[in-house]
């Protein structure tokens, strides 16, 4: 459980990452994790008010009785009718909600990459070997979905590790598209629909950029709107660590599909499902907070440990 606390900043112990808040003439102390403290330290000046979620229970820490800070909601300085807002998570969430509700076609994209061999992998360079995407119109209706295998360029044969992990055979790669063929199909799709491209993490955009450079093709990624759903989740829920795609799916549907196929189209489908769940959160149709996120992920970890 968490408590909501707000009050005037009374003092800061930078070495111990503790802030003191004064409420009704009473001073209480709160401990912040290193990353959080570094992010907000610039705002901790005299006259600042801090609004935050903290742990319900107290503990002793290096001479203080403290509660751990879970999340900072707002940092402001009152100036009569015109307070100065230094940080407000509600404004940030509003911006994320605006992105999520943008009325334009959306392309949910995922790649599978070649993997290095078990030995002699020093000169190995990964390549896109499978593409999966789902295209929706501005209303969210699916208008296309495709899956392609892509022929490798630098290493003609995929490694045994790739075959085992992705459950793919060399024949499937050999019968796939040349990257230039995929490039033509993909750029035509982008020009036709001008979609928002939704990915989980930054790797897909980075790998596309590398492949375009490797094949001496014009790089379209700077002029394409890529939206990283992982980054939006970390910002919206104030997550300290990266969240895996299938953990995110579990948050919304509590259905464990960890035994994934390692298939690009399947991962694109999961990305779309996560988008749909997150959109409901942004539009207040589903309740999900930092606390419930941690609780659900903890439950999933316990289930997996029990199964093992």
What do these predicted ranges mean?
Residues 106-110, 227:
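Short hydrophobic beta-strand that contains or immediately precedes a catalytic carboxylate
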Residues 273-308:
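Acidic two-metal-ion nuclease catalytic site recognized across multiple nuclease folds
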Residues 111-115, 231, 270:
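Short, glycine/acidic-enriched loop or turn micro-motifs at the edges of active sites
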Residues 221-233:
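Conserved beta-strand -> loop -> alpha-helix junction used to position metal-binding or nucleic-acid-contacting
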Residues 101-105, 113-205:
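Conserved non-catalytic scaffold segment of RNase H-like nuclease domains
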């Amino acid at each position: 459980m968490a408590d909501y606390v707000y009050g005037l900043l009374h003092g800061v112990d930078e070495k111990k990452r503790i802030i003191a808040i004064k409420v009704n003439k009473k001073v209480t102390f709160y401990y912040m994790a290193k990353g959080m403290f570094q992010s907000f330290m610039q705002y901790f000046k005299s006259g600042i008010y801090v609004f935050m979620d903290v742990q319900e229970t107290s503990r002793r820490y290096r001479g203080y009785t403290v509660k751990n800070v879970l999340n900072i909601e707002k940092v402001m300085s009152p100036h009569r009718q015109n307070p100065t807002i230094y940080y407000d998570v509600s404004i940030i969430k509003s911006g994320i909600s605006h992105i999520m509700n943008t009325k334009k076609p959306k392309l949910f994209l995922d790649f599978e990459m070649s993997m290095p061999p078990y030995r002699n992998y020093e000169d190995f360079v990964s390549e896109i070997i499978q593409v999966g995407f789902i295209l929706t119109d501005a209303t969210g209706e699916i208008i296309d979905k495709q899956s392609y295998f892509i022929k490798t360029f630098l290493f003609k044969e995929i490694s045994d590790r790739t075959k085992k992990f992705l459950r793919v055979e060399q024949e499937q790669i050999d019968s796939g598209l040349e990257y230039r063929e995929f490039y033509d199909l993909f750029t035509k799709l982008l020009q036709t629909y001008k979609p928002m491209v939704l990915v989980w993490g930054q790797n897909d955009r980075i790998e596309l950029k590398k492949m375009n450079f490797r094949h001496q093709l014009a790089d379209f990624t700077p002029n394409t709107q890529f939206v990283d759903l992982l980054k939006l989740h970390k910002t919206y829920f104030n997550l300290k660590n990266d969240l895996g795609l299938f953990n995110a799916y579990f948050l919304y549907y509590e259905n464990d599909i960890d035994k994934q196929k390692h298939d690009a189209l399947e991962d694109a489908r999961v990305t779309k499902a996560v988008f749909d769940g997150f959109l409901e959160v942004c539009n207040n149709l589903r309740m999900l907070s930092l606390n419930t996120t941690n609780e659900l992920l903890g439950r999933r970890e316990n289930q997996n440990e029990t199964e093992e």
